[in-house]
Amino acid sequence: MKEEWTGELIGKMHNKDITLDDLAEELGVGKSYVSMILNGKRNPSGARERLYSAFEKIAERKEKI
């Protein structure tokens, strides 16, 4: 089941032009794995915190460019 936070994160990714590839690279996992989490097909413990942390790091780097 897809959780509400995943939709929020996808919206934020869209607004900041951050891709699944960006998140996957930051986390050191495959793009398909990130997609499964965001689509509710996987729910590993700590996923929300890890994905939001990676998102914030990427967003900060993009703002400095």
Range-by-range predicted roles:
Residues 9, 20, 48:
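Helix-turn-helix DNA-binding elements, focusing on the entry/boundary residues of the two helices
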Residues 1-15:
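A short, Lys/Arg-rich alpha-helix, primarily the initiator
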Residues 47-64:
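DNA major-groove recognition helix of helix-turn-helix/homeodomain DNA-binding modules
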Residues 15, 33, 47-51:
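Extended, folded domain segments that form the structural surfaces/walls around functional sites
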Residues 22-24:
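Short alpha-helical "recognition helix" segments of helix-turn-helix
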Residues 29-43:
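Recognition helix of helix-turn-helix/homeodomain-like DNA-binding domains
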